[in-house]
Amino acid sequence: MPRRKSVNLVRDIGVDPRFGSYLVQKFINIVMECGKKNLARSIVYDAFDSVAKKLNGDDKKALAAFEKAVGQVKPFVEVKSRRVGGGVYQIPTEVRTGRATTLAFRWMIESASSRSDKTMGLRLAHEIIDAAEGNGNAVKKKNDVHRMAEANRAFSHYSW
């Protein structure tokens, strides 16, 4: 039995300077590639500016649209492969909240990258607007994951 207290493994990433939001800071960190945080920050802020312009609002409307989009894309269940006996089963499992937001961010970035707009900021903006309205590739991906979990619900008793 260890003599010292357990170490908290979750790092505090703080909040972003413009919106004061933990969610936006996390999104910037996931957009970031090769440690280029200023570039990631400018991409995300350009996307928020485009969203605000499209919604005829300010930063608060853009942030509200982003939070709504993330809520629309977050999965509740996912499937995990588990070997039981001679076969491999796709077992539906619940998704923790932290993983759900991370998956939502990844899917939004992935589907924005596959769009054909000129800049990444515009692609992200269009994906945020589409996801907030309930359509778009990221929402489709979430629905596919949920459909897969529903199809394999018979194997849910294998989760342990």
Indicate where each model-derived feature is located.
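Strongly charged
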Residues: 2-34, 38, 46-160
